[in-house]
Amino acid sequence: MTVVVGYITGKSGRSSLHLGVEAAQTLKTSMTVVTVVPKPWTTPSPARIDAEYATWADQLGSDSQREAQATLDKIAKGFEVSYHKFASRTAGEGLLDAAEELGAQVLVTGSCPHGALGQVVLGSTTDWLLHSSPIPVAISPRGYRGAKSGKLIRVTCAYSGTPESVQVVERVAALTDQLDVKMRVVTYAIRGRTMFPPRVGVHAEDSLLDAWADQLRETLAKLKADNVVGEDVELQVVTGNGWDAALDDTEWDDGELLALGTTSRRSIKTVFLGSHGAKIIRHSPVPVLVLPS
């Protein structure tokens, strides 16, 4: 088993490498850096063009390995790292092929380079992976350089209150027990833009939001009453006028990981995000682990 990290020079920065090292060290396993290069088209073309394409693909793989190795030599000296190049029609398919062939426990990707520093920014490849991967996918915030503590301290599980999300809490609880790290369960009460008709007024909206938050606290408390989580697990309800405000108002520790589950799709074990899950990811200031249903 290994942690597979997708990396290609000039794309997404080095944040995935930093998260990959933390993941591999936490899981006490090896790390494999995978570069996916475009697969040649099967349509006939002049031999010179084919040769130039093959040379370019080889160079892209070599440059990516050299750049990744230079970074990892600084942050993970003596750590077991291997490098592989896969050819595929798309980066996402190549990463899943690599994950299957290499026996990956988790697939790590970086954020899109176009977006706010310090937040998870989904690019097209990562977005596709979140709808297709049969294994957990970890995403690093843009510019992520690892926890100052150098290790995982706590896992926060985003909980929606559905039966499926209870199963996610159980899986995260088992993971935190295995890794001997703290766990927190957080659920969000978000005020919608059209929560009530404007004539009702802000005070009525506040009252409804407070009542909703109280109901969510009761739902969270049931996790302990039903022995889904232990008494030492922190339970928290966070309210906000939007997902961005709610995630900002959530207190995050150095070395924290946000874990969330997915929505079932055709009974296939793949990662498939609901609308709330996607919004949580896009506003997360800490690395995110998305678990397949």
Predicted stretch roles:
Residues 108-111, 136-143, 288-292:
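Short beta-strand elements of ligand-binding domains
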Residues 32-34, 82-86, 138, 184-186, ...:
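General small-molecule cofactor/ligand-binding pocket signal
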Residues 1-54, 153-206, 225-228, 232-234, ...:
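Small/aliphatic-rich secondary-structure junction motif
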Residues 145-153:
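Intrinsically disordered, low-complexity Ser/Thr-rich linker and spacer segments
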Residues 12, 70-107, 225-258, 266:
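Structural beta-alpha unit
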Residues 51-66, 203-215:
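A short acidic, glycine-rich active-site loop
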Residues 106-128, 150, 257-283:
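Glycine-rich, Arg-bearing micro-motifs that act as flexible, cationic patches
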